[in-house]
Amino acid sequence: MKNFIGGEWVESKGELVDIVNPANQKVIGKVPMSTKDELNAAVDAAREAFPSWRRTPPLSRVRVLFRLKELMEEHFEELSRIQTVEHGKTIDESRGETRRGIENVEVATDVL
C-alpha cells in the first residue's frame, strides 16, 4: 500500500504491520506504518493544495464529491466486506456504515 502525497503514489519506508481481523484474530494482510517524515510530507502537500481547492468553484467541488458518491455506490458491497473483515463487524453493520458514508457525501454536496 502506498501513500498519496502531493498528487502521487509514494512507497512508504515504514515497517510493515499486520492487519488483524478482530472477529477471529487472523492476519489478513500487512500495511506499512508511515513514517513521521511521510506524514509531515502529506500534511505539507495538503496545506499547499488547499488554496487552490478553496478557489475551486462550488459546482466543480460538487462534481468531485458526486463522483466520490458514485464510486462508493458502485463499490458498496466491496467497501462493506472490507469493513467487516478489518473491523470484525457483521455485514449488516458494515452495510449500514457504508450507507451512512454515502449519505455524508450527499450532505456535503448539498452544503456546497
Go through the PLM ranges and name each one:
Residues 1-30, 63, 67:
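Terminal low-complexity tails and localization/encapsulation signals of metabolic enzymes
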Residues 28-112:
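Glycine-rich loop-to-alpha-helix module at the N-terminal edge of alpha/beta enzyme cores
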